Amino acid sequence: MIMTMIQAINQALTQEMERDDRIIILGQDVGRNGGVFRTTEGLFDRFGPERVMDTPLAESTIVGASIGMTALGLRPVPEIQFMGFIYPAFNQIVSHVARLRNRTRGRFTVPLTIRMPYGAGVKALEHHSESTEALFCQIPGLTVVVPSNPYDAKGLLTASLRSDDPVIFLEPTKLYRAEKQEVPEETYEVPLRRAVVVREGKDLTIIAWGAMIPAARQAAEAAQAEGVGAEIVDLRTLSPMDRETFVASVRKTGRALVVHEAPKTCGLGAEIAATIGESALLSLDAPVLRVTGQDITVPLPKNEGLYYPGPERILRAIRRLMEY
């Protein structure tokens, strides 16, 4: 079936709720309204208010209540309307969600999946366009997942919902309706913690995730016209990171470019660059470069293009790498 990322996410939620009656969805407007982006559309009518719960605008309460649900054997799926609204819940996530399994020596698990849209590219204001995934990657005990297409969105979400450990599931708003793709109607999993090479190349490696994958593809096609073969690695799971896949690619190509829309300073690109330096230094023909968002608050919509990494900036970085 051809579907958008929103439809793929909705189908994954529907199928898993049918399969496992312990799955509970909760969040602001997820019930009767079907979610701010309609990712939960139809679920309230199908499963009822006891399994699709509208909550107040209180992120700490949404996540805190979800922790309590896991103690009762449920598998909650809290939705936060935008990544920029998650910060009131950080104490719950850092102090409890990520630690309970270790704190109880495995007697309790926290099988919850926190879903939230993230990222710029849709002309939205600051709290609605943030990309602070590196904050979650700094917290041991969390799995951080970002799909870049409808097929992966369904499979990764299915795998997340079946995980006994907590997952931060980040959904790029720019890609919600940007692309339609063939997605199997039957249920399936895309493995967590596994990166994938989505484009083969011999001259350099681009490492990216989420909405930066389509941008990297556009830049790679333009570079191909100039005789440069760019390989693209889609991380898919940001933490724990599949370092082996991108290190193997860099050892083959000899050049590396990391692309993310989060600000540059202390972004995940720095960790990836350090990993390459530690594991593939002698294979490098050029320094590792980064194309990222600017180190500023997300600007007003008319200036978004100055902040947001696009194919043109990626192509310029490719050309610079090939000068070495």
Q: Which residues are covered by each model-predicted region?
A:
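Thiamine diphosphate
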Residues: 1-166, 170, 173-324
